[in-house]
Amino acid sequence: MTARPPESCVLAKDRPEEPVVPVVSPGPLVPVADFGPLDRLRGWIVTGLITLLATVTRFLNLGSLTDAGTPIFDEKHYAPQAWQVLNNHGVEDNPGYGLVVHPPVGKQLIAIGEAIFGYNGFGWRFTGALLGVVLVALVVRIVRRISRSTLVGAIAGVLLICDGVSFVTARTALLDGFLTFFVVAAFGALIVDRDQVRERMHIALLAGRSAATVWGPRVGVRWWRFGAGVLLGLACATKWSGVYFVLFFGAMALAFDVAARRQYQVQRPWLGTVRRDVLPSGYALGLIPFAVYLATYAPWFASETAIDRHAVGQAVGRNSVVPLPDAVRSLWHYTAKAFHFHAGLTNSAGNYHPWESKPWTWPMSLRPVLYAIDQQDVAGCGAQSCVKAEMLVGTPAMWWLAVPVLAYAGWRMFVRRDWRYAVVLVGYCAGWLPWFADIDRQMYFFYAATMAPFLVMGISLVLGDILYHPGQGSERRTLGLIVVCCYVALVVTNFAWLYPVLTGLPISQQTWNLEIWLPSWR
């Protein structure tokens, strides 16, 4: 949407008998100054209320399901490793496995909770639950900024609170919750950077500096993009799948720059992006994440007894043009061992798990993961036979809409050129599509934890379109509000129904059977 700046009027007469007609001199079109929502106080109040609700749901009975005091599912790896980090000067000795297969940040964060509350269920889950609460606040702020609506942002927060995947992930000491937090935070930083760059370009256009060169103006230091690089580095230092988001978000950031220069009348927007933005973007979203990743290994570098600390790689750096220090070569060797472990974790090599799944089942949560189940001597359900189980499963009222929501988002992106849906698709696909590159690999549905916030964002944008359809009358507006309220109520009800199997509450065998909606959930 554009508007013409006021210009001086000239008077013209084509014929002596015609009246004088004012003619406006053509001037450059100035994009509307829209750089984010304006209801700041109300926005923060709503964010605070939603965050308070998220705090209750994430921390209520957080340490209850611990399988007689021991970690559940893959907590059995990360809770002890975090305890080692806490008591071994920041590094793992890992005597049970002899191999560390993930970078250190997630375990360092788990160790914070264990340091405060001890080696128990609440302790090793505390930091993940805390960041799960902050994740809800981030999604509220991100969707509010993308949609320019505090109401739509609030809806997104409620939906994320009621998402089974995000809920269980925040309440278990697995690495995927930390990965999700960092990538969503980086995504939010890039969205703010997008608006900030447009604001600076707007000022430059009004000042007449946009046409000074064919490349357009410089936009100064972009601290939000720098912060995104730091967060992406922490994501990679949690799980290597953070690299996928570095690539997808890097491309998204450059697309933002090209679009901004085109929108603000730069003569050569592509050339301007190459000239002005590619190198700074590569520094912020390439070099900075790598530097942060290395920095997280500081305790490993400082240790004399860490795994492979002095096991220099066989061929790494020996004949290289730039000789590498032995410590770096040892880290390469250490990393290569972890990589070979993951590369060999395939079905063809005989690695199977009863709850593994493939990525084509993830969008609709067709094959969840059973984290824990106890059917022996369970009491407290009021029936003769009780079950206590915790399952990672997406709330069907949202996840079963994934395919139509993705299709609609694709239509909005390619046909309507709607950047809001485009960025949501970028985030969703970064957490999903790369896993198709190696279908033989053993995979689990909890890898889809990073997809959940972007699914919620997409659904929220659709609900926002229903609420704020251009040109709608009062009846149409009322109908849209009713539809949105009914849908949100359906999601909340669905979440409440699944709550026992998301938290491990005792339920009867009959109720357990009713909770299992699909054969593939067994």
From Swiss-Prot:
Mutagenesis or variant effect for residue 371 to A: Decreases FasC(His) mannosylation when expressed in M.smegmatis
Q: How does it sit in the membrane?
A: Multi-pass membrane protein
Its pathway is: Protein modification; protein glycosylation
**EC number annotated for this UniProt entry:** 2.4.1.-
Give GO terms for biological process.
Answer: protein O-linked mannosylation
Q: Which controlled-vocabulary keywords does the entry list? A: Cell membrane, Glycosyltransferase, Membrane, Transferase, Transmembrane, Transmembrane helix
Which is a Pfam family this sequence falls into? PMT
Q: Name one GO molecular function term.
A: dolichyl-phosphate-mannose-protein mannosyltransferase activity
Could you say which enzyme class this protein belongs to? transferase
What turns on expression?
Answer: Expression is increased in infected macrophages.
> Does Iron-sulfur show up as a keyword for this record?
no
Q: Which InterPro entries match?
A: GlyclTrfase_39-like, Glyco_trans_39/83, PMT_4TMC
Please give the name of this protein.
Polyprenol-phosphate-mannose--protein mannosyltransferase
> What species was this sequence derived from?
Mycobacterium tuberculosis (strain ATCC 25618 / H37Rv)
The gene name on file is pmt
